Amino acid sequence: MNVKNPPFSVVRGSAAARIALSFVHARDRIDLVAAEILAIEARAEQTFFCDDTGAYHTFQLPHVQLEFAPHIGARIHRLTSQILDEELALLVDGEVIVRPVVREPIGWRGHMSLSANDMDEAEQLAGRLRRCWVNPVLRVV
């Protein structure tokens, strides 16, 4: 082994310690590592497409937008398709941060949004979710 230039690896502890975000319901649990979360963004407005008119409408609706790797979006969609009108717990660091009621299947397009009462609440929720993107610890192996 070359002592002057030792190899490095990124280590964040056990498998459980590497979980960034979890979706938990009695039917299933989906654990995500940080690399499977592509974006977390607090937004003030949300745009919807109206099937009846074919038009897009934008409303002042504070929320947090989450974007996932495609395979994760598919798993979330399968789960939420089965649990309509039921709670789905979202955990960060093993702590439940929100328990939204699933009103429609989510995740099919690889993203979802979590409603907030105002932008301050959206920013706080986004901040808690971003905690999963901590700087890794480097260790000589």
What are these model-derived regions, one by one?
Residues 1-141:
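Structural signature of multi-pass, alpha-helical inner-membrane proteins
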